[in-house]
């Protein structure tokens, strides 16, 4: 049986140990029944009972999901298509090329790196091509949604680069260009990172590229959350505006399988990434994910602009409906958002994660985020919301007032969450068909 881990917080560790004890005492048949039941439990939560407002997740096209169980993924794929180390990969290598070509077309890129297991690892690849351990990279603060993979406790720090938190403009929820320029001239970073886990307004990519060129740095745009909007041309195009490379998560607004991607228009950057990917950080990789990405890109070629535009429209309508219900939506005096995401200020509710746990009891799924506001002890000071999965299931602007009312009823104490949950589930079950699928 799994041993206890004293370094893990007490509550989660007790929960895991109780489950491990149960599973350790069961037969293989019993554990199989449990496994199938857990899979169904997850399906019911996300497809029938709950509204998922987390912009870090989405519903995948069933055809793309089928690619993950197509028998391709168990075939090792070492080396370049056309000259694989293993034999019998004629079908697999064609899948790899097709997926890369479709990714390049959708993102307007000349080069696409698929051999990336996650968005965090995509950022690691980026730091590895730009810097060596001990060098400095500029990254966004968690206060404006900077991801932990940018920071000392994540991929950047594990690799050994020094992550310098860039000065930020709280009103624009992005970096402060003038102060950034001063710091860059003084500290000479090897890479400047833009793109957050919460993106409300456009980032100053062109201005940052000018600064990077002055000091000989690369510009990384982390599009983990924005890649769907970028693919659908409802956001600025980072590669066109000056980013040397763009890292992606494929399962958020892009609605594909779990994993990462990197795209670039710079041949030298592509060459360095190729070397990091192989023989550096990957030998064999999951070709089934490449097939799933290819299937996902076909949806974006046909419906990408429509889907992305609808995510933004619905996000704005949702945020405005929450304001009307009396909730303190962040940046409400500045237009709230131009993306598929926004946030609620958490000070009046005990913190963002406290709010998320309260809403979970009403079958509404969300999560906390950092905001440029006073900190909350033991919690984050914002609650992040987004529309990728809502729109994927057919919700539109006209449906947001009712959803906003459910949320306000819970957060403002009009009703206890368990009283709201049945009505939430009844409303959720009206949206039972995935949209923007070929």
Curated annotation (Swiss-Prot):
Pfam families with a match to the protein in the record: SHMT
UniProt record, GO biological process: glycine biosynthetic process from serine; tetrahydrofolate interconversion
Chain segments annotated as coiled-coil in the UniProt record: none
InterPro entries: PyrdxlP-dep_Trfase, PyrdxlP-dep_Trfase_major, PyrdxlP-dep_Trfase_small, Ser_HO-MeTrfase, Ser_HO-MeTrfase-like, SHMT-like_dom
Uses described in the biotechnology field: May be used for efficient production of optically pure alpha-methyl-L-serine using L-alanine and formaldehyde.
Reactions accelerated catalytically: 2-methyl-L-serine = formaldehyde + L-alanine
EC numbers, comma separated: 4.1.2.-
Activity regulation behaviour: In the alpha-methyl-L-serine synthesis reaction, activity is inhibited by an excess amount of formaldehyde (at a concentration greater than 10 mM).
Keywords assigned: Lyase, Pyridoxal phosphate
Top-tier EC class: lyase
N6-(pyridoxal phosphate)lysine PTM sites in chain numbering: 252
GO cellular component assignments: cytoplasm
Subunit annotation: Homodimer.
Biological role stated in the UniProt entry: Catalyzes the reversible interconversion of alpha-methyl-L-serine to L-alanine and formaldehyde. Cannot use alpha-methyl-D-serine, L-serine or D-serine. Cannot use D-alanine instead of L-alanine as the substrate for alpha-methyl-L-serine synthesis. Does not require tetrahydrofolate (THF) for activity.
Family statement drawn from the similarity comment of this UniProt entry: Belongs to the SHMT family. Alpha-methylserine aldolase subfamily.
Name recorded for this polypeptide: Alpha-methylserine aldolase
Provenance organism: Ralstonia sp
Organism taxonomic ancestry: Bacteria, Pseudomonadati, Pseudomonadota, Betaproteobacteria, Burkholderiales
Gene it is expressed from: msald
């Amino acid at each position: 049986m799994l041993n206890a881990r004293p370094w893990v917080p007490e509550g989660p560790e007790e929960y895991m140990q109780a489950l491990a004890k149960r599973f350790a005492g069961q037969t293989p048949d019993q554990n199989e029944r449990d496994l199938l039941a857990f899979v169904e439990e997850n399906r019911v939560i996300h497809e029938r009972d709950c509204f998922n407002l987390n912009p870090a997740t989405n519903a995948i096209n069933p055809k793309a999901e089928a690619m993950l169980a197509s028998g391709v993924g168990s075939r090792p794929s070492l080396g370049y298509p056309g000259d694989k180390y293993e034999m019998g990969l004629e079908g697999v290598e064609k899948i790899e090329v097709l997926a890369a070509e479709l990714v390049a077309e959708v993102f307007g890129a000349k080069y696409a790196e698929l051999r990336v297991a996650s968005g965090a690892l995509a950022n690691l690849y980026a730091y590895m091509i730009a810097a060596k351990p001990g060098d400095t990279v500029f990254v966004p603060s968690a206060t404006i949604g900077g991801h932990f993979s940018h920071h000392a406790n994540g991929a950047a720090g594990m690799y050994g680069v020094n992550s310098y938190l860039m000065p930020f403009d709280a009103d624009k929820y992005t970096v402060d260009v003038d102060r950034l320029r001063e710091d860059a001239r003084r500290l000479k970073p090897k890479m400047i990172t833009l793109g957050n886990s919460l993106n409300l307004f456009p980032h100053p990519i062109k201005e940052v590229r000018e600064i990077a060129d002055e000091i000989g740095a690369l510009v990384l745009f982390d599009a983990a959350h924005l890649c769907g909007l970028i693919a659908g041309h409802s956001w600025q195009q980072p590669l066109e505006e000056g980013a040397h490379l763009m890292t992606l998560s494929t399962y958020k607004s892009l609605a594909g399988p779990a994993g990462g991607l990197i795209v670039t228009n710079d041949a030298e950057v592509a060459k360095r990434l190729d070397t990091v990917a192989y023989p550096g950080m990957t030998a064999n990789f999951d070709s089934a994910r490449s097939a799933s990405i290819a299937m996902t890109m076909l949806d974006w070629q046909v419906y990408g602009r429509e889907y992305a535009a609808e995510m933004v429209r619905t996000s704005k309508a949702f945020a405005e409906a929450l304001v009307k219900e009396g909730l303190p939506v962040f940046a409400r005096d500045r237009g709230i958002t131009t993306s598929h995401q926004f946030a609620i200020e958490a000070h009046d509710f005990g913190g963002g994660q406290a709010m998320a746990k309260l809403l979970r009891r009403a079958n509404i799924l969300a999560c906390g985020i950092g905001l440029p506001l006073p900190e909350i002890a033991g919690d984050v000071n914002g609650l992040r919301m987004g529309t990728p999965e809502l729109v994927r299931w057919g919700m539109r602007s006209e449906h947001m007032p009712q959803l906003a009312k459910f949320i306000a009823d819970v957060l403002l104490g009009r009703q206890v969450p368990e009283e709201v949950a049945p009505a939430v589930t009844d409303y959720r079950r009206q949206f039972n068909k995935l949209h923007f699928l070929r």
